Design a protein with these regions (language model features):
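Flexible "arm" and connector segments at domain edges
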Residues: 1-53, 57-95
């Protein structure tokens, strides 16, 4: 599934709820899901990692949609490697 297709499915599925919650409320839900992903990673919970990554992606798609951001366009910044140095793998000095 392409990012734009995924974003469209999420938009059609949750548009009404996301609109009622607004950008701030939807962003807070996404942050909660990031916390759940952090817990699954910290506990090395193989069974739950994929589930939580999917939840984070879905909430990111919701935030992007109600903020007017196209995920395909946003991801295209990385289409040719590192957006700073242009290399694959990144050749930037560590930060």
């Amino acid at each position: 599934m392409e990012l734009g297709e995924f974003q469209d499915v999420i938009r059609r599925t949750y548009r009404t709820r996301d609109a009622a919650r607004g950008v701030d409320g939807t962003f807070r839900w996404m942050v909660e899901e990031v916390g759940e992903l952090a817990r699954a990673l910290r506990l090395d919970d193989d069974a739950n990692r994929e589930h939580e990554v999917g939840d984070v992606l879905a909430w990111l798609a919701s935030v992007a949609s109600i903020a007017g951001v196209d995920l395909d366009q946003a991801a295209s910044r990385y289409a040719h490697g590192c957006p700073r140095c242009g290399a694959i793998p990144c050749a930037c000095p560590p930060r």
